[in-house]
A protein has these predicted regions:
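Active-site lid/adjacent beta-loop-alpha segment flanking the redox-cofactor pocket in flavoenzymes
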Residues: 163-230
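A structural signal for short hydrophobic beta-strand segments in well-ordered beta-sheet cores
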Residues: 23, 105-108, 174, 182-183
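Dinucleotide-binding Rossmann-like beta1-alpha1 core, especially the glycine-rich loop
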Residues: 1-58, 180-183, 187-191, 216
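Short aromatic/hydrophobic contact patches that present stacked aromatics
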Residues: 20-24, 70-72, 158
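Central helical "cap/lid" subdomain
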Residues: 120-173
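A general structural signal for well-ordered alpha-helical segments in protein cores
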Residues: 2, 30-33, 52, 84-85, ...
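Residue-level detector of anion-binding/catalytic polar loops
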Residues: 46, 98, 148
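Helical element adjacent to the flavin cofactor pocket in flavoenzyme catalytic cores
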Residues: 70-129, 133, 137
Length: 230
């Protein structure tokens, strides 16, 4: 999709197909990854099963002492969020879509139990269908129409190292599910993130996502992050 759109609208999404490597450190996880690989191959997805020796050879940055193996998906990748957003917007406009920026939804209009439109910046816009694609704000917007959406954001932590000499720009995204961590190359540095089991609910004082938090950040909490670096 992204490659086709890049050509269609002549704008780069910053797409890099470095692949993704998922590793296993116990038998249960290894069996799970093997099942995933088998299922993916049934749908003609390119998945390669690697033993620990292959992982050590191809990705010496990984300590393989406790690794049983992994699966590599060369078709996975990452893109620049701003590039993707602009590319999708440009493609949508070419197909006749209109985009209104800085236009928060004041109200979802309904009649006889059916959604009929939205009120934006004081202006009512009639529509046959509404697609709610507002991420972590979806729950609050759904409430305006009496809809309960079971969605709530959690704080997400990551760190970025200092520049690492000879760090490969083609390093895949490495996922270590057993340690709830992931790693990827980021402009010559290594980004390390976590998806912890006991995550911290965001905005737990008000239980509401601020309208102006699009580019906001949470305070540092290294005590919460540090156990995953051991």
């Amino acid at each position: 999709l992204y490659k086709d759109l890049e050509k269609k609208v002549d704008h780069s999404a910053g797409l890099r197909l470095n692949g993704a490597l998922s590793i296993a450190q116990n038998k249960e996880r290894w069996q799970e990854l093997l099942r995933q690989a088998t299922t993916a191959q049934l749908y003609d997805v390119d998945v390669r099963v690697l033993n620990k020796d292959q992982i050590k050879k191809d990705y010496p940055i990984i300590n393989t002492d406790e690794i049983l193996g992994g699966i590599f998906m060369p078709g996975d990748g990452a893109a620049d969020p701003s590039g993707v957003t602009y590319m999708l917007a440009k493609a949508a406009k070419k197909e006749g879509a209109q985009i209104f920026e800085k236009s928060p939804v004041d109200e979802i209009l309904t009649k006889q139990g059916k959604i009929t439109g939205v009120k934006v910046n004081g202006q009512e816009i009639e529509c046959e269908y509404i697609v709610l694609a507002s991420g972590m704000w979806s729950r609050q917007i759904g409430e305006k129409a009496g809809i309960s959406i079971p969605l709530y954001p959690a704080e997400h932590f990551y760190i970025i190292t200092e520049p690492i000499e000879n760090l490969s720009k083609t390093l895949p995204v490495i996922r270590d599910f057993d340690n709830r961590t992931y790693f990827k190359e980021d402009a010559g540095k290594l980004l390390v993130g976590i998806f912890e089991g006991n995550s911290i609910p965001a905005f737990n004082k008000t239980n509401k996502v601020p309208e102006d938090f699009s580019f906001g950040e949470f305070p540092e909490n290294f005590e919460h992050f540090e156990p995953y670096l051991k």
